[in-house]
Amino acid sequence: MPFSHTKIVGPAGRYGARYGMGLRRKVTAIEVKQRGKHRCPSCRSLVRLERIAFGIWRCPKCGFTFAGGAWTPQTIMGKALAPEELKEVEAQKAKWKEAVK
């Protein structure tokens, strides 16, 4: 079977004329985000993360497995909370370094 979609319709081209244009546009938007390159939270490399199951992602470079969003590795809410969590982690690292000294 030849390539199932074109540049214009993207991944939703496999549906042909079925389901309506609105739904096919939504599917295209979701799948382009899902299959795009994302940063691994462990090694910080920009790679195409593998979706293992619903909300479970794995980095092909370092093998790190983590929980994320259903269709994208990081949700909008997760991005909003990430800076706060980073501050906490940095504070814990600083305390640990002081305790070791």
Curated annotation (Swiss-Prot):
UniProtKB keywords: Metal-binding, Ribonucleoprotein, Ribosomal protein, RNA-binding, rRNA-binding, Zinc, Zinc-finger
GO biological process, one term: translation
Family matches, as Pfam families: Ribosomal_L37ae
Co-factor(s): Zn(2+)
Keyword Zinc-finger: yes
Record text on cofactor binding: Binds 1 zinc ion per subunit.
Zinc finger (C4-type) in chain: 40-62
GO cellular-component term (any): ribosome
InterPro entries: Ribosomal_eL37/eL43 (IPR011331), Ribosomal_eL43 (IPR002674), Ribosomal_protein_eL43 (IPR050522), Ribosomal_zn-bd (IPR011332)
Residue positions binding Zn(2+): 40, 43, 59, 62
Molecular function, one GO term: zinc ion binding
Keyword Ribonucleoprotein in annotation: yes
Family to which this protein belongs: Belongs to the eukaryotic ribosomal protein eL43 family. Putative zinc-binding subfamily.
Subunit structure: Part of the 50S ribosomal subunit.
Protein function: Binds to the 23S rRNA.
Stated name of the protein: Large ribosomal subunit protein eL43
Organism: Pyrobaculum aerophilum (strain ATCC 51768 / DSM 7523 / JCM 9630 / CIP 104966 / NBRC 100827 / IM2)
Gene name of this polypeptide: rpl37ae
